[in-house]
Amino acid sequence: MVKAKMVKACNTKNTGMQPYRVIQDEHISRLLEIGVGSGLLTDALFENFSVDTLYLNDLYDNIQTNALPKDIDANYLIGDIGMIDLPKTLDGVISSSALQWIYPPDVLFKRVFQTLTAGGFFAASTFVEGNLSEIQALTGRGLPYDTPKQLMVRLNQAGFMIDEFKADEQVLYFDSPMAVLRHLKATGVTAVGTEQACWSKQSLAKFCQNYQQFHTDAGYTLTYRPLLFVAHKPMKPMSSPL
């Protein structure tokens, strides 16, 4: 039940799905969210779970203005998740549209594994190879992405057992190449070097001209490759293969 609910909670932020109605509450004692941002995943969390102690991480301290339930014990961990100390004995770690900034993620995965209690879960959405393929094709810029298989191997090597693992492809359509750039600036979920400050008048015109190859009857395409996973720390250490 926890696995199914957490998949849906992470999916809420990634796809714009509305939080679903809760029938049975689940309780989590100690939980960490990596990359809180505007708090969409946090909101979905409290629609479906009760939490005693919540640790909220982000690079920026403005997350402290996000609305939270009055009775929650909230603790803010401001800074690079790869550099700061993680809380101990967590029951769960969640993240949405943030892990792609950490590459390779092996060290973080191992740290998350170590801080979880036996049976604790790690649930997240991120992006995989092929994400924003149109932008990378035109600019040669973008974040490095794993294939789904590579990401699964990293989780297994950190010690996790995989419960849910699903890659998807979502194609958005826009009225113009400039609308694509405005969307990327507004979302800020991935670095592609498309900030307008980086463009000259000539390079921007060339980009818009070259983007014509991605025009369809429905509009100009922009492809996302999100991936959702839920994994857990085994109750007993996994035996190494002979």
What are these regions (language model features)?
Residues M1-I23:
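Class I SAM-dependent methyltransferase Rossmann-like catalytic core
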Residues L32-I84:
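Class I SAM-dependent methyltransferase SAM/SAH-binding core
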Residues S38-L40, D146, E164-L242:
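Conserved Class I S-adenosyl-L-methionine
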Residues G82-V93:
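A short acidic, Gly/Pro-enriched loop at the edge of an enzyme's catalytic core
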Residues D91-P105, T126:
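A short SAM/SAH-binding and catalytic strip from SAM-dependent methyltransferases
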Residues D106-F121:
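A short glycine-rich, Lys/Arg-flanked "PGG" loop and its adjoining helix->strand segment in the class I
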Residues F121-P148:
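Conserved class I S-adenosyl-L-methionine
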Residues P144-G159:
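Short alpha-helix
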